[in-house]
Curated annotation (Swiss-Prot):
<dbReference type="GO" id="GO:0005524">
    <property type="term" value="F:ATP binding"/>
</dbReference>
<feature type="binding site">
    <location>
        <position position="581"/>
    </location>
    <ligand>
        <name>Zn(2+)</name>
    </ligand>
</feature>
<dbReference type="GO" id="GO:0006055">
    <property type="term" value="P:CMP-N-acetylneuraminate biosynthetic process"/>
</dbReference>
<feature type="binding site">
    <location>
        <position position="588"/>
    </location>
    <ligand>
        <name>an N-acyl-D-mannosamine</name>
    </ligand>
</feature>
<feature type="binding site">
    <location>
        <position position="420"/>
    </location>
    <ligand>
        <name>ADP</name>
    </ligand>
</feature>
<feature type="binding site">
    <location>
        <position position="19"/>
    </location>
    <ligand>
        <name>UDP</name>
    </ligand>
</feature>
<feature type="binding site">
    <location>
        <position position="23"/>
    </location>
    <ligand>
        <name>UDP</name>
    </ligand>
</feature>
<comment type="subunit">
    <text>Homodimer. Homotetramer. Homohexamer. The hexameric form exhibits both enzyme activities, whereas the dimeric form only catalyzes the phosphorylation of N-acyl-D-mannosamine.</text>
</comment>
<keyword id="KW-0418">Kinase</keyword>
<feature type="binding site">
    <location>
        <position position="417"/>
    </location>
    <ligand>
        <name>ADP</name>
    </ligand>
</feature>
<feature type="binding site">
    <location>
        <position position="259"/>
    </location>
    <ligand>
        <name>CMP-N-acetyl-beta-neuraminate</name>
    </ligand>
</feature>
<feature type="binding site">
    <location>
        <position position="579"/>
    </location>
    <ligand>
        <name>Zn(2+)</name>
    </ligand>
</feature>
<keyword id="KW-0067">ATP-binding</keyword>
<feature type="binding site">
    <location>
        <position position="569"/>
    </location>
    <ligand>
        <name>an N-acyl-D-mannosamine 6-phosphate</name>
    </ligand>
</feature>
<keyword id="KW-0511">Multifunctional enzyme</keyword>
<feature type="binding site">
    <location>
        <position position="253"/>
    </location>
    <ligand>
        <name>UDP</name>
    </ligand>
</feature>
<feature type="binding site">
    <location>
        <position position="418"/>
    </location>
    <ligand>
        <name>ADP</name>
    </ligand>
</feature>
């Protein structure tokens, strides 16, 4: 209690609505109960817990030895959309009296259910602090809207995954009030060991059932497409009947459409079928043993994509209800579960497999983190929550200073040798540029980027430039959605799995975009260069390596794993020289600056490089420019090497033309002017006649990487899209 400055126990109200949220809240409740010196626990039970058709699951809370302070009957029967709305309204009518009586310091609310929305709304309007469990996640249904609405009402957030944490930050929630703890249920899942699991299996599925030889099915209605979800449930039952394995079917939740799903079960005689056991509720301790030892789980419950991964049990996820969730390799998605055969094939593929344990959603230590977080809450702090919005003008009316400001971006280019930061105007003018040697270690590099950006932002104020955001161009494979460098090039050391967005955004309080340098060059051409107004074009960068970017229908193509446009690694020869990627015969192995330097050194070592009018100082390394100079001065061998390099690049372009059929190819970088004529010749000789009319040009942009990085920021401000 000394930690938060409170001079009394923290009164915590945990409100639970159904069997699913109790499985997440129970570990926290047990943790609170073990620390009576710090906490007082009040338990409020409402929703489907109190309905007989759904198993009267409030009894399991009593069996766990929790005193239920209040039972609220809040469900309006009908199982349709109107009934859900009326249930929220009924809860809003009843909750104020309860909260006035309990007077909690903080209410813990879980997830994305309509009951939880009523709880959060009531607490927020009554100035009660709210701790929201599992915010920031994405499922792909109406639940997302409810979950994010609760996030906006909540004062504190406990999330389960790094992505969820980033989503909360993107939603402008206060970083200091977000805890990445993992899922509380994983504390139980990862320690769940029951030697007598066979007795649990026999109790629910019969004496003749073996471990890993049965299925658990749990499917809920999709409230935005009830008709389709009922049809999908019917197909699922038909497939399970045909698959002919013992199956435990749990009744659906109370959402709109659940009544129709139960009718489907009864129409098909599932409750009396010898291969099926239909149940309204299974206690969580027993349920985890059942899924842990099942041959497969099928349905669309979040339990399948979240909790079951802890055991490596195969899961078949049907439809779109969990389409946005992060999943382990144990999950097979059947998004268009529109035929019985498709579902049956999925059962044949998954049943009986065993996958590694997945810890995407937790490591088993969530509850201690949450209790520590609760203890840190200072009740003396103002209740009003703060949002971390990017800086914007407070006054929307125009004044002369606003009109005279230059809308600009901070652009960062992480090259193999140098680190550059520039202030770039909306017109593509580089107002000021800073250059430093790129450090070799991760810590030094991040520190230098932050230092240079802070200095540039301060200078921008003096130059009357309004910085709208930060764009970063870097070598390697980049996930632009998360702002993370996944894998770097060999030229940039210690640069794998690096989150660039968060430290810069936290320091500068500006939005940050990150992308691969080849993609940035293509975006620069689209906004400022010869690609402006072009629907389809390809940019090839010729420098130390070979990179590129593809614009298709005005949009940049990233590919399914952010690996599109690795054009330098198109193979143009089966027995060509080794490439830095580990393959051989790539364009980069012939036409990059590194490749030309390699050939220049060979010639120099054999005294075949220098011709009359040339010299290389002893302290100067032989490089590509010496090879080019020798070729210009008539060195036949140097000319042959350049011709081979240009031919390799040309063959790569031909492959691109035959694949993408762009109307324009832009060669960029220091070597572009030396290759342009050779590339055009190769196209005339090797390409199909239908693509030979393509325009192949040399870029006229001086700093495409910086301009492309800036364009990510400047495009966002004008188009208002990410």
């Amino acid at each position: 209690m000394e930690k938060n400055g409170n001079n009394r126990k923290l009164r915590v109200c945990v409100a639970t609505c159904n069997r699913a949220d109790y499985s997440k809240l129970a570990p926290i409740m047990f943790g609170i109960k073990t620390e009576p010196a710090f906490f007082e626990l009040d338990v409020v039970v409402l929703g489907s817990h109190l309905i007989d058709d759904y198993g009267n699951t409030y009894r399991m809370i009593e069996q766990d030895d929790f005193d239920i302070n209040t039972r609220l009957h809040t469900i309006v029967r009908g199982e349709d959309e109107a009934a859900m709305v009326e249930s929220v309204g009924l809860a809003l009518v009843k909750l104020p009296d309860v909260l006035n009586r309990l007077k909690p310091d903080i209410m813990i609310v879980h997830g994305d259910r309509f009951d939880a929305l009523a709880l959060a709304t009531s607490a927020a309007l009554m100035n009660i602090r709210i701790l929201h469990i599992e915010g920031g996640e994405v499922s792909g249904t109406i639940d997302d809207s409810i979950r994010h609405a609760i996030t906006k009402l909540a004062h504190y957030h406990v999330c389960c995954t790094r992505s969820a944490e980033q989503h909360l930050i993107s939603m402008c929630e206060d970083h200091d009030r977000i805890l990445l703890a993992g899922c509380p249920s994983y504390d139980k899942l990862l320690s769940a060991k029951n030697k007598d699991y066979m007795s649990i299996i026999r109790m629910w599925l019969g004496d003749d059932v073996k471990c890993k030889d049965y299925i658990v099915a749990l499917q809920h209605p999709v409230t935005t497409d009830i008709k389709h979800s009922i049809k999908m449930f019917e197909l699922t039952l038909d497939a399970l009947i045909s698959f002919n394995k013992r199956t435990l079917v749990l009744f659906p939740n109370i959402d709109a459409g659940s009544k129709e799903m139960v009718r489907v079960m009864r129409k098909k005689g599932i409750e009396h079928h010898p291969n099926f056991r239909a149940v309204k509720h299974v206690p969580f301790d027993q349920f985890i043993q059942l899924v842990a030892h099942a041959g497969c789980m099928i349905g669309n419950s979040s339990c399948g994509v979240r909790e079951v991964g802890a055991f490596g049990t195969p899961v078949i996820n049907l439809g779109t209800r969990q389409i946005g969730r992060e999943t382990g390799e144990n999950v097979l998605h059947v998004r268009d579960a529109d035929t019985q055969d498709k579902i049956l094939q999925a059962l044949h593929l998954q049943f009986g497999k065993q996958y590694p344990c997945s810890k995407i959603y937790g490591d088993g230590n969530a509850v201690p983190r949450i209790l520590k977080f609760l203890k840190s809450i200072d009740l003396q702090e103002p209740l009003q929550k703060k949002f971390c919005f990017p800086p914007v003008k407070e006054n929307i009316s125009q004044d002369i200073d606003h009109i005279l400001e230059t809308l600009s971006a901070l652009a960062v280019d992480l090259g193999g040798t140098n680190l550059r930061v520039a202030i770039v105007s909306m017109k593509g003018e580089i107002v000021k540029k800073y250059t430093q040697f790129n450090p070799k270690t991760y810590e030094e590099r991040i520190s230098l980027i932050l230092q240079m950006c802070v200095e540039a932002a301060a200078e921008a104020v003096k130059l009357n430039c309004r910085i709208l955001g930060v764009g970063i161009s870097t070598g390697g494979r980049v996930n632009p959605q998360e702002g993370v460098v996944l894998h770097s090039t060999k030229l940039i050391q210690e640069w794998n799995s690096v989150d660039l967005r968060t430290p810069l955004s936290d320091t500068l309080h500006l939005p940050v975009w990150v992308d691969n340098d080849g993609n940035c060059a293509a975006m620069a051409e689209r906004k400022f260069g010869q690609g402006k107004g072009q629907e389809n074009f390809v940019t090839l960068i010729t420098g130390t390596g070979i990179g590129g970017g593809i614009i298709h229908q005005h949009e940049l193509i990233h590919g399914s794993s952010f690996c599109a446009a690795e054009l330098g690694h198109l193979v143009v020869s089966l027995d060509g020289p080794d490439c830095s990627c580990g393959s051989h015969g790539c364009i980069e192995a012939y036409a990059s600056g590194m490749a030309l330097q390699r050939e220049a050194k060979k010639l120099h070592d054999e005294d075949l490089l220098l011709v009359e009018g040339m010299s290389v100082p002893k302290d100067e390394a032989v490089g590509a420019l010496h090879l080019i100079q020798a070729a210009k001065l008539g060195n036949v061998k140097a000319q042959s090497i350049l011709r081979t390099a240009g031919t390799a690049l040309g063959l790569g372009v031909v492959n691109i033309l035959h694949t993408m059929n762009p109307s324009l190819v832009i060669l960029s970088g220091v070597l572009a002017s030396h290759y342009i004529h050779i590339v055009r010749d190769v196209i005339r000789q090797q390409a199909l006649s239908s693509v030979q009319d393509v325009d192949v040009v040399v870029s006229d942009l001086v700093d495409p990487a910086l301009l492309g990085a800036a364009s990510m920021v400047l495009d966002y401000t004008t188009r208002r899209i990410h």
